[in-house]
Amino acid sequence: MRIGMIGLGKMGGNMRERLRRAGHHVVGYDLDESLRDVGSLPELVEAIDNDGLRVVWVMVPHGKPTRSTVEDLAELLTEGDLVIEGGNSKYTEDLELDALLAPKGIGYLDCGVSGGIWGLENGYGLMVGGRAEDVEKAMPIFDALRPEGPREEGFVHAGEVGAGHYAKMVHNGIEYGLMHAYAEGYELLAAKDIVKDVPGCFQAWSRGTVVRSWLLDLAVKALEETPGLEGVSEYTTDSGEGRWTLEEGIEMAVPMPVLAAALFARFASRQENSPAMQMVAALRGQFGGHAVQMLDGHDAGQVEVHQGAEPKHDADRARVDQGGGPGGQGGDVRAAEGADDAGPSSGSGSTGGPVGPTSGTGDVDDRG
């Protein structure tokens, strides 16, 4: 089958090669002259005629690059031809692109692709959205790209246009949570002196355990290549699909606390100094007299706490709102909260937890 492939980066280039290994004739175009087979989109379209059916796979960054490419193809292709968008477009963009092509009789499929740089040898997981007749036209392509074995274990026709990229979006949201769970486990193992072989623990988990996975295998490989992750920056970007997934969770009222925590951790990794945590540190110093660490490394010491200044809210009212009152069963809401509120001047009656190591006052915050 003759196929046009637009975008020959790490993914597109490997997909072209895998299709060629399966016997397909793939004509590739890329802005990089060293990668492409033809010099323009018109040349590509001319070279891929299959007795009246032309199939073009688009593998460029989502947003404007994808839309611009599809708009150009709309002027070059004719009724009965097919465009497959294999990048990471948002599913709402798929609906717009389909609406652009449909009046001309040009089919449109959105295909979420997973497998990364390993897909050339292992095959790609494919999630497709679109009309059944268009999926059938492209099935020889999908069968060549997916892993060997039963079709349903590496390919799904997820639904109508947009469903493929929606499924891939959720897939990536799950990926965020899985990666962060492994990352938290790694940090805790590395922090405890009793554990002497952290990479060995990860490797031992790779066979027979309930947490074994390909991501875990990749974590083992990363620790082999970079022991202790020495020199690896904590700065972590995001592709945008985690955000889209979380937005969908909000829209559909589906709780997604794991994804939210993983995504926000990536945001935090990019902050050299977090304004939010600077404010928390300053506030702890103000209301609890806790030591405040300054950016130059010196300890600013404890803030002097002046007694007698009443809070602006009605303390008795707050206790009543908590189900008690002065002398009632509800007790003092401050004591019930414990932790930060029970600062050095609070006395020893806090129920927040163990007594602090030096204050003898019930301060339990930030002790590891």
What kind of region is each of these model predictions?
Residues 3, 31-96, 102, 120-130:
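Rossmann-like NAD(P)-binding element
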Residues 22, 104, 252:
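Conserved dinucleotide-binding and phosphotransfer motif residues
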Residues 69, 90-187:
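Rossmann-fold dinucleotide-binding core
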Residues 300, 309, 315-318, 335-345, ...:
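Short linear motifs in low-complexity or flexible loops
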